[in-house]
Amino acid sequence: MTIAKLIDHTALKPDTSKAAIMQLLEEAKTHQFASVCVNPTWVSLAAKELAGTGVDVCTVIGFPLGANTTAVKAFETKDAIENGATEVDMVINIAALKDGEYDAVEQDIRAVVDAAKGKALVKVIIEACLLTDEEKVKACELSVKAGADFVKTSTGFSRGGATAEDIALMRKTVGPDIGVKASGGVRTKEDVEAMLAAGATRIGASAGVSIIKGDQSAPSKDY
């Protein structure tokens, strides 16, 4: 499998233009990335442009704070799938996790999993930079219990991104059968290789083209 097939080619900044999205989609088709990850407003366009190309359409739910109500996250998921999304990256209720409200966190994840059941993969963003190691483990355990397909390090919009240490901890926690996605600050082929070595099975990056070309001058940005 090529590195490209492990990358979610990503554009999530709020000022991303239609022209930039069209460029992202063309790059995804050319390089055959695993998916494009775009904000919900672009899902319909992405699904139309990528139909039959083998590139999946990923979007984000409760993004980037995770502070939406569970009902809203479930609705967002259903709406995204109706518009053509085949993968959804949801943000957990971070405050509830830190307050020890584990049932609420699990129910929040499960609502998205249920809304996506059989129609889209669910990746759970734990926003690792805001959590203690114990909280990271708990977030991963709750994600597995709720039926998620992946756990994911970061939104790329908080104070830190993916680290090899977090990936290793997440992989150890979820075991071999759940995906682990590294996102936030992954900008070079060497970054990707370090994440894969630590246990990642998917990479979220806006610098996907630079990564696969081995360009060391990739722009210093996350999403």
UniProtKB/Swiss-Prot annotation:
Catalytic reaction list: 2-deoxy-D-ribose 5-phosphate = D-glyceraldehyde 3-phosphate + acetaldehyde
Known EC number: 4.1.2.4
GO BP, sorted A to Z: 2-deoxyribose 1-phosphate catabolic process; carbohydrate catabolic process; deoxyribonucleotide catabolic process
Protein name as annotated: Deoxyribose-phosphate aldolase
Name of the coding gene: deoC
Organism of origin: Bacillus pumilus (strain SAFR-032)
Protein function: Catalyzes a reversible aldol reaction between acetaldehyde and D-glyceraldehyde 3-phosphate to generate 2-deoxy-D-ribose 5-phosphate.
Superkingdom assignment: Bacteria
Active site: D89, K152, K181
